[in-house]
């Protein structure tokens, strides 16, 4: 499951569109990887695809809802994901930035995956 959480700057801001950016993994020496999020928004409902481009965690489909200024997105990852990812940040003026935390599922922990955290920034394309 991939979990994305953040804040919208105002109710009029939309998360709709393609977001491209970069993650910096503080746990393993600041290594960087690309991230892409494709979002469709229908009023307060959000859905889309999140792809981590380093192939360490795969991709996942997510659905979520906006409640006022809060944006919370939770998703089930595909069979190659095996982790829960929480993104916490702010979306404002076409930029989404903040921190993330990766927690392995029990099956991924058995394969040696560990908790990781870092920062991210994505820009609307």
Language model: regions and residue ranges:
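Bacterial N-terminal signal peptides
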Residues: 1-6
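C-terminal motif of bacterial Sec signal peptides marking the signal peptidase cleavage site
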Residues: 9-10
